[in-house]
């Protein structure tokens, strides 16, 4: 049955306009993005099918072009649309961060870092560079691959901090396993970087680990 034949109060778009996006299920939100279904399936039916195929919204959003377009109803145009929407969301978060102190809104900072790194399939190490008022200047990925004390070079981190004229920074890396518990190597790396950056008067405010669920703050865990 076409969504157009549904009662207005049950249609996803009308529900969003009346109640807000937060009131909709994942399938309803995805149906609005899809706009149309396929033969024998409404947009909502198709959305439910896709969420089942991808085992949830996260895997669907993180899928590469080949995996995404292998599903009925999803083509390159939809993939491009989705990437554009997600990038606009990331930029909106970054713009909001630049207006406020990172210390005053740590939850927003962690959500931003999660949005930047959660889709990465391999380990990535990055820095969020801040000015002397703890406002975000820029986010930069510095290393890809195995993230440990022997692979991440303090000299390069110091060099990028100096290039941005940063007063402080927040270290960040992801755990593709989804488990955010810091390893001994994570703790040792944080100590090395903190000591190296202290020599050029750049303060390390936190080290955030991104995985499944909420990002982990090493400061809040008492590990820095």
Curated annotation (Swiss-Prot):
Keywords on record: Hydrolase, Metal-binding, Metalloprotease, Protease, Zinc
GO terms for biological process, alphabetical: proteolysis
Transmembrane segments: none
Motif window: JAMM motif: 173-186
Disulfide bond entries: none
Family (UniProt): Belongs to the UPF0758 family.
NCBIfam families: PRK00024.1, radc
Database matches in PANTHER family: DNA REPAIR PROTEIN RADC, UPF0758 PROTEIN YEES-RELATED
Name of this protein: UPF0758 protein PSPPH_0210
Species, as recorded: Pseudomonas savastanoi pv. phaseolicola (strain 1448A / Race 6)
């Amino acid at each position: 049955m076409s969504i157009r034949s549904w009662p207005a109060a049950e249609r996803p778009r009308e529900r969003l306009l009346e109640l807000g996006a937060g009131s909709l299920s994942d399938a309803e939100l995805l149906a609005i993005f899809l706009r149309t279904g396929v033969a024998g399936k409404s947009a909502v039916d198709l959305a439910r099918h896709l969420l089942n195929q991808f085992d949830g919204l996260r895997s669907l959003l993180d899928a590469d072009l080949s995996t995404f377009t292998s599903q009925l109803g999803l083509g390159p145009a939809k993939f491009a649309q989705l990437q554009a929407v997600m990038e606009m969301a990331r930029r909106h978060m970054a713009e909001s961060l630049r207006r406020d102190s990172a210390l005053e809104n740590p939850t927003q900072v962690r959500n931003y870092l999660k949005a930047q790194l959660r889709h990465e399939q391999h380990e990535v190490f990055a820095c969020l560079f801040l000015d002397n008022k703890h406002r975000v200047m820029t986010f930069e990925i510095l290393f890809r691959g195995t993230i440990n004390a022997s692979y991440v070079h303090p000299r390069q981190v110091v060099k990028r901090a100096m290039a941005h004229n940063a007063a402080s920074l927040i270290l960040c890396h992801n755990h593709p396993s989804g488990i955010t518990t810091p390893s001994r190597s994570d703790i040792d790396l944080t100590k090395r970087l903190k000591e190296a950056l202290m020599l050029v008067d750049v303060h390390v405010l936190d080290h955030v680990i991104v995985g499944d669920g909420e990002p982990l703050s090493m400061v809040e865990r008492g590990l820095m």
